Amino acid sequence: MSVQDNNEGRPELGPVEWGKVVEYHLWGYVAKLNDSGDIGLVDAVSSHDLLERRIPDCWPALGDHIKVRRLGVAPGGQLRLTGRQSDIDLN
């Protein structure tokens, strides 16, 4: 599934999907999507709506099941995800 730009040039978010946190990096965490098995990155900026909650101490634990949405694919081919509640709640 690809994510396409809307009329304003911003990416349209994919549907809400469940994933499992499988890995941490300094810049974010990796989730494996339950249905597709795709692996994607939730970078720190996309991890939470509140700036003070975007730190590793506030990220979900390894093995936690989380809701995410696809943001698109980075130039290097990496799937980008968002875990921000404001993005999850969008229709």
Regions found by a protein language model. Name each.
Residues 1-91:
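Single-stranded RNA-binding regions, centering on S1/OB-family and related RNA-binding modules
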